[in-house]
Amino acid sequence: MSSPDCGYASDDQIQRSCSLPMMMGQYQWTEPRTVFQEGKPKRDEVSANSRSKAEARIRRPMNAFMVWAKDERKRLAQQNPDLHNAELSKMLGKSWKSLNLATKRPFVEEAERLRVQHIQDYPDYKYRPRRKKQVKRMKREEECFFPSANIPGPEAMVNNVMVGQKYKMQYSVQNLQENQLPTAGYFEGHSPMGYFYKDYDVPNYYTSQNSSGYCSPPTQDEYQALSYGFGSSYMPYQQTTTTPVMAKQISVTQNIPQESPEHGMMASPQMYNGQMYLPECAKTHPVAQTEQHSPSHQSQQMVSQNYLQSQQDGHLETDIDKTEFDQYLMYEPKSDPELIYTIDQDSGPYSTNLLPSLISEANNVCYYDYCGV
């Protein structure tokens, strides 16, 4: 009797059984089976080696508490199977402390016997404590405090460096622009002599641009000359009309050695004339500058004319007391005697004619400043 499937099923079963090993042999995932089977003996060998090392390590002899807790721990573990080993250790410690000496004596004697036996078995034994794993704990704590997710990558670090350099460049350029020249309000009404010449009609740098007396702010070089111009004889602006006395005065002051700031202040002719340091725009506006002269300039011309008349009448410098003007001067007392002494020692041709002029001009300047004119 023929089968209901007409013999196809048997042929399919034979074909599948024959083709299955051929197909399985082409894939690589079938090979690790042998590797897995071969890996089992290796793991067994590693575990056996660890056990042999543990057995080879010499243990320390037990003390009385360990001898007593060996059997007591087992009893507590059977009574309280849910308790953790740490809880069992706490309970054993409390119960051991509560025991009296008579109860502890057999365990103490057993511990002493084990110690003697250990010495006999291992005469060269030396206790070597295990290394504490503090380094690994510290590393773990650092990883917890500083997780790797918060550490920026190399690209972020490069971006931070570029941003820092850009900010530093902007800051340096801003500082350079701010430090090149002071603010506009700094030069308003200021002069090299400061307090002593604040009441005079000194032309300001920052006036209206529409006025004829307007001049641009000083450059950096002019600002340096302004701040350090006390001892220099640089005169960017001079009067067009000079008297013979002023010519003698300029020639003599160039020969005076400048040993202190007071000498430099008294040696510059613009200090006597009441003229402050003016920028180069003063040359382009001589009319506007001449209209703003101080009263000391007019009085100076009168003093010089009176001095010429007194020289023609035969007055000598010996008739003048050199110390009577000290009470009117607002400078340091040593500045004028030093200047007088230096001028007296000068052997120039105009040394005898310069002293009265200097004293009268200094008195005139200080008088106007004291009276607030």
Swiss-Prot record:
Gene Ontology biological process terms, A to Z: cell differentiation; gastrulation; positive regulation of transcription by RNA polymerase II; Wnt signaling pathway
GO molecular function, one term: DNA-binding transcription activator activity, RNA polymerase II-specific
Biased composition (Basic and acidic residues): 39-55
UniProt-listed InterPro entries: HMG_box_dom, HMG_box_dom_sf, Sox_C, SRY-related_HMG-box_TF-like
Cellular localization per UniProt: Nucleus
GO cellular component terms given for this protein: nucleus
Keywords, in A-Z order: Activator, Developmental protein, DNA-binding, Gastrulation, Nucleus, Transcription, Transcription regulation, Wnt signaling pathway
Domain named Sox C-terminal: residues: 256-373
Chief localisation class: nucleus
Location of the region described as Required for transcriptional activity and interaction with ctnnb1 in the Swiss-Prot/TrEMBL record: 324-328
Annotated region (Disordered), positions in chain: 33-55
Annotated motif 9aaTAD, positions: 323-331
Alphabetical list of PROSITE patterns matching this protein: HMG_BOX_2 (PS50118), SOX_C (PS51516)
Pfam families, sorted: HMG_box
SUPFAM superfamilies: HMG-box
DNA-binding interval(s): 58-126
Domain notes: The 9aaTAD motif is a transactivation domain present in a large number of yeast and animal transcription factors.
Quaternary context: Interacts (via C-terminus) with ctnnb1/beta-catenin (via Armadillo repeats); this interaction is required for inhibition of wnt-signaling.
Primary role: Transcription activator. Doesn't appear to bind to the consensus 5'-AACAAT-3' DNA binding site, but binds 5'-ATTGTT-3'. All of the sox17 proteins are required for embryonic endoderm development and gastrulation movements, and show some redundancy in function. In addition, the sox17 proteins have distinct but overlapping roles in later gut development. Acts downstream of vegt-signaling in endoderm differentiation to induce a range of endodermal genes both directly and indirectly. Also represses wnt-responsive genes to inhibit wnt/beta-catenin-mediated signaling.
Protein name (record): Transcription factor Sox-17-beta.3
Organism of derivation: Xenopus laevis
Gene name of the record: sox17b.3
